[in-house]
Amino acid sequence: MLGPMRHSEFWERMDHHLGRAYARVWADSQVIDELDHRTPSEALEAGLSPKLVWRAVHARLELPPVDY
């Protein structure tokens, strides 16, 4: 993916991989070390870029490289 990622694209990817109902629950509950021990939701709220947060989520979920 080139360029910055919008928050809406981040959530579209989350919905695609985890389902719309579960994506928010997962993002609110999974603490990821690479996000300074924050959940994805906390990291986004703290101002981390959606692209950086997606990379950490991608690694945690062990998604195939094509979904990067």
Write out the residue ranges for each language-model feature.
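C-terminal alpha-helical interaction appendages
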Residues: 1-68
